[in-house]
From Swiss-Prot:
Subunit structure: Homodimer.
Top EC group: lyase
Source lineage: Bacteria, Pseudomonadati, Pseudomonadota, Gammaproteobacteria, Thiotrichales
Protein name: Dihydroxy-acid dehydratase
Chain residues that bind [2Fe-2S] cluster: C52, C125, C197
Binding-site positions, Mg(2+): D84, D126, K127, E448
Organism name: Francisella tularensis subsp. mediasiatica (strain FSC147)
Length: 560
């Protein structure tokens, strides 16, 4: 008996009672034969106003052409996106994280309402990646991700630069390290065309995680946006989605607990973004896999950092592509027994089978260190707890800035206040900068603190101050930084009670973050604390404040 591949769409296309549905589909140009073909949603996060996304409509057309060669019907649709790089450092960065859940909601909505049989999702920027994955997990229909791809490095006076160079140029100019003319030249040359920010920032981190999970084709995460190989990846979309339909392989068959462990290992080895903690928690929630922040610490305890990527290192993702790409890294890890090779992937094969014929990394490469010569012996993403963060926090400690910091609190109730303090010289060596009321509810939307960390680095204070926040950090942030502090200030967490001059210890060896206050002093301060007014009174941010969970639960909006 022939397998039915259009088991969802036939509800509309073959049911006589759905004549109006069929009339509208005929009106789109479909013919009689099309009515019996499986319908594949091609969900692109295309928009013109961002280098990460500007080319995705073209990729979606390549995917549609490939899908239709396989006697399937490709149905392109779009969803929204937010450019973190553009909104960073402004009040409207509040819209970034909630766009992840809007992307998931909108893809789920279109796919479900139109009864599509499968999904090829094409994200390009930071929140696009987990948003598409959460939709795939919720729907649990055959599907996979084609990453829009990474940008090429910019070049200024013979040296490679990127988006973080542009962010740091302001602080460097303020401190006299570069001229205004050099700053202008930097921002004009940092982004040479289409593709996601080039270092191991959030988009590339999540692309690596998705490939390690088995939810994208091999090499997807490291293939540059404008390369021939990215077009070739799109050309494989049709045969890939048809194979998934024929084998009835669905996201929840692939996104297992072991697959998430593979993802956590790879992003640790790659030196990935702190945002991966939030996003993997949310993606796991979408497929009912039990994952917690403590699982990240378990992986960090036994997994080294090997990749010398920006922001703390030298290289960008396009450099890795040139020496074998992400699969070459995973092959090395598989040989070392660090990955589960038996995990199923969207090729229909296991991870080990996918990697079988992949070439090894060149012996003399300087991008990926050998296991016996790591950049850091344990993971850079450290989960810290203590009286400042009873429910946890996420630190990004590469080791270059040390692993213990003791200093005095310099407290700011917003990102803008802290930026003004740096500009006027009110941030000093030895400070533990505290930026609060920037959490999921308080921000709202848990804005990223890339502007503050870039100012610190640009001003030459990266080795001399620490920064803690209930907000997030961009994948481009580096230094001695601790984010995702829970409970957040808006809900009366300890970070709301900190005062200037408090002695704070951040210990990434013992995984603690404490303020030197007695329980009695903390109780006295707590009794005087009053909740602040919500920053949004209408619209999508108001809804987000009411529904979002804590950072330690992934900031999802659909928990009971």
């Amino acid at each position: 008996m022939k397998k039915i591949l259009n088991k969802y769409s036939r509800r509309l296309t073959e049911d006589k009672s759905q004549g109006a549905s069929q009339a509208m589909l005929y009106g789109t140009g479909m013919n009689d034969a099309d009515m019996h073909k499986p319908q594949i949603g091609i969900g692109s996060v295309w928009y013109e106003g961002n280098t990460c996304n500007m080319h995705l409509n073209q990729l979606a057309q390549f995917v549609k052409d490939s899908v239709e060669k396989e006697n399937l019907k490709g149905m392109r649709f779009n969803t929204i996106g937010v450019s973190d790089g553009i909104s960073m450092g402004t009040d409207d960065m509040s819209y970034s994280l909630q766009s992840r859940d809007l992307i998931a909601d909108s893809i789920e909505t279109v796919m479900s309402a139109h009864w599509y049989d499968g999904l090829v999702s094409i994200p390009g920027c930071d929140k696009n990646m987990p948003g598409c994955m959460m939709a795939l997990g919720r729907l649990n229909r055959p599907g996979f991700v084609i990453y829009g791809g990474t940008i090429q490095a910019g070049v200024m006076r013979g040296k490679p630069i990127d988006i973080v160079t542009a962010f740091q140029s302001y602080g460097a100019c303020l401190s006299g390290q570069i001229t205004e003319q050099e700053r202008q030249e930097t921002i004009k040359k940092a982004c040479p065309g289409a593709g996601a920010c080039g270092g191991m920032y959030t988009a590339n981190t999540m692309a690596c995680a998705i490939e390690a999970l088995g939810m994208s084709l091999p090499f997807s995460s490291s293939t540059p946006a404008t390369s021939v190989e990215k077009v070739q990846e799109c050309d494989k979309a049709g045969e890939t989605i048809k194979n998934l339909l024929e084998l009835d392989i669905k996201p929840r068959d692939i996104m297992t607990r072991k697959a998430f462990e593979n993802a956590m290992v790879l992003i640790t080895v790659m030196g990935g973004s702190t945002n991966a903690v939030l996003h993997l928690l949310a993606m796991a929630s979408s497929v009912d896999v039990d994952l917690s922040i403590d699982d990240f610490q378990e992986i960090a305890n036994k997994t080294p950092v090997l990749a010398d990527f920006k922001p703390s290192g030298k290289y960008v993702m396009a450099n890795l592509h040139a020496i074998g790409g992400t699969p070459a890294v995973m092959k090395m890890l598989l040989k070392a027994g660090m990955l589960h090779g038996d995990c199923l992937t969207v090729t229909g094969k296991t991870l080990a089978e996918n990697l079988e014929n992949v070439a090894d990394l060149p012996e003399d490469n300087t991008i990926i260190h050998k296991l016996d010569n790591p950049i850091k012996k344990t993971g850079h993403l450290q989960i810290l707890k203590g009286n400042v963060a009873p429910e946890g926090s996420v630190a990004k400690i590469t080791g270059k800035e040390g692993e213990i910091f003791e200093g005095v609190a310099n407290v700011f109730d917003s990102e803008e206040e802290m930026v003004a303090a740096v500009e006027t010289g009110k941030v000093k060596k030895g400070d533990v900068i505290v930026i609060r009321y920037e959490g999921p509810k308080g921000g709202p939307g848990m804005p990223e603190m890339l502007k503050p960390t870039s100012l610190i680095m640009g001003a030459g204070l990266g080795q001399d101050v620490a920064l803690i926040t209930d907000g997030r950090f961009s994948g481009g942030s580096h230094g001695f930084i601790v984010g995702h502090i829970t409970p957040e200030a808006y809900e009366g967490g300890m970070i709301a009670l900190l005062e200037n001059g408090d002695k704070i210890t951040i210990d990434a060896i013992n995984n603690v973050i404490n303020v030197d206050l007695s329980d009695q002093e903390i109780a006295q301060r707590k009794s005087k604390w009053r909740a602040s007014k919500q920053k949004a009174s209408r619209g999508t941010l108001k809804k987000y404040i009411k529904t979002v969970s804590s950072a330690s639960k992934g900031c999802v909006t659909d928990l009971d």
